[in-house]
């Protein structure tokens, strides 16, 4: 009887320990700017990575288009662009852009569907797996190879970032990217969040603003956008130009924190938090950015 009881207890203990075990995932996020499709637009590609494997991807592109038939990026009405044109997201303007592709180039696939096919193809692969890939089943976009190369580049960028640990299944995880206006009227915010069942696991913030081309690095293809900008500036990523932008903040506003450090502090605060817990938060310890509440609200928006 003792032997039987001992064996039963051992089995139950093993079962209990197995049942208590949780999946553990080490995840990273990266975002890159590129020129996957010609000279009239720039690409923003965001990747979530586990180890070397791509977990999720979002691709979008930005181009100047007719302001009477498209929706501009947030604050576009305040940007000094050529009359009749403004900067747009192709994903946001999927139907209009796709109709143009169909009428002018005979395209049979909507741009967003093409992006999605490429994103789905890349998920589960490594950057090395994507090297040299020039075609994707189900994607008829002419520059498919360029988009795949941008995903590989974003995966490599993600590998250089600090990982976060998530305990539990990520089967329901989803990466979303949203546009907003977290900081005034002179720029627009691009915010990514990877969320699992109401929890922000990873987040990423960047902003885009028109600045002096002699002291900053423009977005890819910025030199080809000059005819659309009327005040001699060009569009830049604030992260890419962190040093210059932060120096301006310090000189003009007395800022004591670099912009990218502020973004990162907000991201670190939000990562691991329930979306509901972030609603209405307006301050983050260690972050002195004046519009902290706005950035958190954008992460919440992306997570939803």
What are these regions (language model features)?
Residues 16-19:
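C-terminal motif of bacterial Sec signal peptides marking the signal peptidase cleavage site
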């Amino acid at each position: 009887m003792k032997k039987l009881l001992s064996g039963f207890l051992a089995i139950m203990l093993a079962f209990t320990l197995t049942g208590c075990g949780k999946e553990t995932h080490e995840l990273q996020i990266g975002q890159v700017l590129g020129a996957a499709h010609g000279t009239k637009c720039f690409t923003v590609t965001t990747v979530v990575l586990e180890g070397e494997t791509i977990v999720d991807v979002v691709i979008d592109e930005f181009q100047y288009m007719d302001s009477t038939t498209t929706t501009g990026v947030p604050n576009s009405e305040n940007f000094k662009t050529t009359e009749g044109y403004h900067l747009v997201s192709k994903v946001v303007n999927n139907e209009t852009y796709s109709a143009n592709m169909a009428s002018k180039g005979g395209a049979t696939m909507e741009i967003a569907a093409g992006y999605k096919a490429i994103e789905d193809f890349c998920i589960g692969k490594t950057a090395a797996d994507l090297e040299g890939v020039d075609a994707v089943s189900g994607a008829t976009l002419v520059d498919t190879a360029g988009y795949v190369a941008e995903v590989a580049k974003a995966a490599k960028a993600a590998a250089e970032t600090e990982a976060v640990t998530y305990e539990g299944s990520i089967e329901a995880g989803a990466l979303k990217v949203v546009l907003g206006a977290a900081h005034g009227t002179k720029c627009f915010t691009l915010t990514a969040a990877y969320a699992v069942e109401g929890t922000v696991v990873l987040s990423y913030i960047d902003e885009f603003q028109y600045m002096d081309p002699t002291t900053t690095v423009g977005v890819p293809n910025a030199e080809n956008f000059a005819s659309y900008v009327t005040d001699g500036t060009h569009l830049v990523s604030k992260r890419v130009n962190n040093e210059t932008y932060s120096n301006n903040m310090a000189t003009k506003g007395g800022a004591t924190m670099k912009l990218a450090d502020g973004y990162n502090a907000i991201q670190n605060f939000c990562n691991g938090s329930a979306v509901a817990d972030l609603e209405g938060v307006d301050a983050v310890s260690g972050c002195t950015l004046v519009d902290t509440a706005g950035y958190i609200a954008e992460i919440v928006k992306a997570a939803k």
